[in-house]
UniProtKB/Swiss-Prot annotation:
Signal peptide: 1-27
Family recorded in the similarity comment: Belongs to the intercrine beta (chemokine CC) family.
Subcellular location: Secreted
A GO molecular-function descriptor: chemokine activity
Alphabetized InterPro entries for the sequence: Chemokine_b/g/d (IPR039809), Chemokine_CC_CS (IPR000827), Chemokine_CC_DCCL (IPR034133), Chemokine_IL8-like_dom (IPR001811), Interleukin_8-like_sf (IPR036048)
Expression (tissue specificity): Thymic medulla (at protein level). Prominently expressed in the small intestine, colon and appendix. Also found in thymus, spleen, lymph node and lung. The long form might be dominant in intestinal, and the short form in lymphoid tissues. Expressed by IL17 producing helper T-cells (Th17).
Cited Pfam families: IL8
Protein name in the entry: C-C motif chemokine 20
Species of provenance: Mus musculus (Mouse)
Cysteine disulfide partners in this protein: C33-C59, C34-C75
Length: 97
């Protein structure tokens, strides 16, 4: 009977581990990622915030996701100069608050 109990415990633990891994995979696949970048710069007055997307997390590319006054999310290349300037400007605004 002890052998049967150990087997049942092993199967229960394996099931819990499998359920956890499946939920992690589902969470990563539901993540909304940038797949490309906007080609034209956004006016800085239209941008109200930003989020950083990192390629080493759930997405394939690094990106800055700008949030606009019209509640749009726009993906931009973090290597572009206009993107760097906009991020710096927004960071300064936050520091002044």
């Amino acid at each position: 009977m002890a052998c049967g109990g150990k087997r049942l415990l092993f199967l229960a633990l394996a099931w819990v581990l499998l359920a956890h891994l499946c939920s992690q995979a589902e969470a990563a696949s539901n993540y909304d990622c940038c797949l490309s970048y906007i080609q034209t710069p956004l006016p800085s007055r239209a941008i109200v915030g930003f989020t950083r997307q990192m390629a080493d997390e759930a997405c394939d590319i690094n990106a800055i996701i700008f949030h606009t006054k019209k509640r749009k999310s726009v993906c931009a290349d973090p290597k572009q100069n206009w993107v760097k300037r906009a991020v710096n400007l927004l960071s300064l605004r936050v520091k002044k608050m």
